[in-house]
């Protein structure tokens, strides 16, 4: 069976790395995620990763508490690099050649982000983990994921959610009548104000015709199911599938 997508970017929340601890980094949890990604990688799919930093730091609350917003955001970018390094180490543990590239140069721990080099790594079947956001404050890791996916010409962004199995018209934890969408267009997401990604990230995905698949990463095997075309979660594209 052939994969539906040949090149993907997986977007993980920082909280996904915290496991049941809720904050920080839980190494067994990271290793479990890395194992699942490695199993997909064996099929020949080219994989890049963007990981948030919310398990270690959140810039907006820090800014609300009086910290300079720019400094708060830069602090968050460093958190994403920590997550990237830990994930890369776990992927290496499973025999996957992995590179970390950061938007802020820190040559002692990672490569600088260079698009051509990232593409060569992918073509050589290496996983690339992008850290430090886009290197500028005020931009989320969702926007980073959409931008890097466009730059590496990914077929899809896999939004691996922590316990959320798709996109709903209301919060299913608060509304028992919430309805899950199987398919949406990027335009519908923006028009309805659905908070899958921020508006900048949604527009980037729409303009570059990148599919977005939102699914529950807590169920083992779901990344592979998405890659091989099994319809789980919610698929967002420029054209709703038949």
Swiss-Prot record:
Notes on activation and inhibition: Allosterically activated by GTP. Inhibited by UTP.
Pathway(s) of this molecule: Pyrimidine metabolism; CTP biosynthesis via de novo pathway; UDP from UMP (UMPK route): step 1/1
Pfam families on file: AA_kinase
Gene Ontology cellular-component terms listed: cytoplasm
EC assignment: 2.7.4.22
Coiled coil among keywords: no
Keyword Transferase on entry: yes
Subcellular location: Cytoplasm
Catalytic activity: UMP + ATP = UDP + ADP
Gene Ontology biological process terms in this record: 'de novo' CTP biosynthetic process; UDP biosynthetic process
Highest taxon in the source lineage: Bacteria
Annotated region (Involved in allosteric activation by GTP), positions in chain: 19-24
Keywords attached to this entry: Allosteric enzyme, ATP-binding, Cytoplasm, Kinase, Nucleotide-binding, Pyrimidine biosynthesis, Transferase
Protein function: Catalyzes the reversible phosphorylation of UMP to UDP.
Subunit structure: Homohexamer.
Family indicated by similarity: Belongs to the UMP kinase family.
Protein name: Uridylate kinase
Native organism: Streptococcus pyogenes serotype M2 (strain MGAS10270)
């Amino acid at each position: 069976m052939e994969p539906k997508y040949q090149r993907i970017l997986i977007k993980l929340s920082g909280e996904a790395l915290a496991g049941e601890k809720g904050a920080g980094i839980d190494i067994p949890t990271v290793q479990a995620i890395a194992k699942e990604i490695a199993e997909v990688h064996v099929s020949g799919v080219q994989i890049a990763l963007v990981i948030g930093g919310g398990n270690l730091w959140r810039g907006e609350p820090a800014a609300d508490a009086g910290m300079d917003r720019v400094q708060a955001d830069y602090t968050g970018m460093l958190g994403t690099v920590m997550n990237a390094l830990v994930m890369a180490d776990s992927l290496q543990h499973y025999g996957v050649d992995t590179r970390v590239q950061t938007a802020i140069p820190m040559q002692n721990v990672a490569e600088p982000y260079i698009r051509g080099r990232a593409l060569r790594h992918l073509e050589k079947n290496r996983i690339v983990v992008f850290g430090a956001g886009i290197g500028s404050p005020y931009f989320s890791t969702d926007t980073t994921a959409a931008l890097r996916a466009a730059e590496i010409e990914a077929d899809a962004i896999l939004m691996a959610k922590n316990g959320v199995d798709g996109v709903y018209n209301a919060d299913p934890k608060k509304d028992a009548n919430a309805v899950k969408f199987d398919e949406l267009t990027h335009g519908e997401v923006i028009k309805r104000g659905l908070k899958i990604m921020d508006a900048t990230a949604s527009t980037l995905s729409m303009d570059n015709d990148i599919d977005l698949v939102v699914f529950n990463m807590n169920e083992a095997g779901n990344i592979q199911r998405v890659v091989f075309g099994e319809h789980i979660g919610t698929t967002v594209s420029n054209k709703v599938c038949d």
